[in-house]
Swiss-Prot record:
Family as reported in the entry's similarity comment: Belongs to the ATPase gamma chain family.
Organism: Synechocystis sp. (strain ATCC 27184 / PCC 6803 / Kazusa)
Keywords for this protein: ATP synthesis, CF(1), Hydrogen ion transport, Ion transport, Membrane, Thylakoid, Transport
Subcellular location: Cellular thylakoid membrane
A Pfam family of this chain: ATP-synt
Species classification: Bacteria, Bacillati, Cyanobacteriota, Cyanophyceae, Synechococcales
Name the record gives this protein: ATP synthase gamma chain
Length: 314
């Protein structure tokens, strides 16, 4: 017969665990909202910067301009910037990003291209640090909500690797935020920048909403800015100098958006994992309660049988 006290203790233990997972789910949801607000707050600057660069590139011929970040070289070494999180309990977020990085590194090595890693997040640092990889730099224990200063620090180190010709290309591997239950590790080339110039692509923003008592994500497509400078506008400085001054801001902004997407993906994965854990805990509590009631009923029945048997023996 099951031990009633043991079952009772386990029910209480699972209830306590459920309280923790539910609290973690709500905290992750609040942080997803903060990530959403940060993306929205940085949009005006990002839009203005994209507009300036987009119009500058229409006035310049990059084929005739010697800008280091646009230099196309035969790739002999490639730097991979791998973005993961600092903590676990977020489903397959970290594992999927690391697997994609390993897959890309293997593809490059099979082509005879050397690979250097720049790691963001404790999970990537721990994993690749124990294996035979050339780690050029690592960044761990960053702010949970990425900020521009951290993005600028990482971007500067990547620019230094590329401009010094330590590497001939820089690729970014991060997790694109799709929805609360879906995220996708993607590979994006950071350097060299496109020789055809900077484009002004359409963008998307996300919003966390509640529907039917559950969290959901709405994605909104944002059209690229179409305004342009007057053709007769005169620059006090050489447009090339203006472009060189704005490129660091552009690089930082591109990296910041990727870090924001990765942070949102991690928080969404954690929220989903904790939601599933809470649901599983609820089911386990129901199963244990049923077992407890059955055991208690069996114990009462046994006691009654013993009493009746004792009475009949008199």
């Amino acid at each position: 017969m099951p031990n009633l006290k043991a079952i009772r203790d386990r029910i209480q233990s699972v209830k306590n665990t459920k309280k923790i997972t539910e609290a973690m789910r709500l905290v992750a949801a609040a942080k997803v909202r903060r990530a959403q607000e940060q993306v929205l707050s940085t949009r005006p600057f990002a839009d203005a910067l994209a507009q300036v660069l987009y119009n500058l590139q229409n006035r310049l011929s990059f084929a005739e301009t010697e800008l280091p970040l646009f230099e196309q070289r035969e790739p002999k070494a490639v730097a991979l910037l791998v973005v993961t999180g600092d903590r676990g309990l977020c489903g397959g977020y970290n594992v999927n990003a690391i697997k994609r990085a390993e897959q890309r590194a293997k593809e490059l090595k099979n082509q005879g291209i050397a690979v250097k890693l720049v790691l963001v997040g404790s999970k990537a640092k721990q994993y690749f640090g124990r294996r035979d990889y050339d780690v050029a730099a690592s960044y761990a224990n960053l702010e949970q909500i990425p900020n521009a200063s951290e993005a600028a620090q990482i971007a500067d180190s990547l620019v230094a690797l590329f401009v010094s010709e330590t590497v001939d290309r820089v690729e970014l591997i991060y997790t694109r935020f799709v929805s609360l239950i879906s995220s996708q590790p993607v590979v994006q080339t950071l350097f060299p920048l496109s020789p055809q110039g900077l484009e002004a692509p359409d963008d998307e923003i996300f919003r966390l909403i509640t529907r039917g008592g559950k969290f959901q994500v709405e994605r909104e497509k944002v059209e690229a800015p179409v305004e342009s400078f007057p053709q007769d506008m005169i620059f006090e400085q050489d447009p090339v100098q203006i472009l060189e001054a704005l490129l660091p801001l552009y690089n930082t902004n591109q990296l910041l958006r990727a870090l924001q997407e990765s942070a949102a993906s991690e928080l969404a994965a954690r929220m989903t994992a904790m939601s599933n854990a809470s649901d599983n805990a609820g089911q386990l509590i129901g199963t244990l309660t049923l077992s407890y009631n059955k055991a208690r009923q069996a114990a009462i029945t046994q006691e009654l049988l013993e009493v009746v048997a004792g009475a009949n023996s008199l």
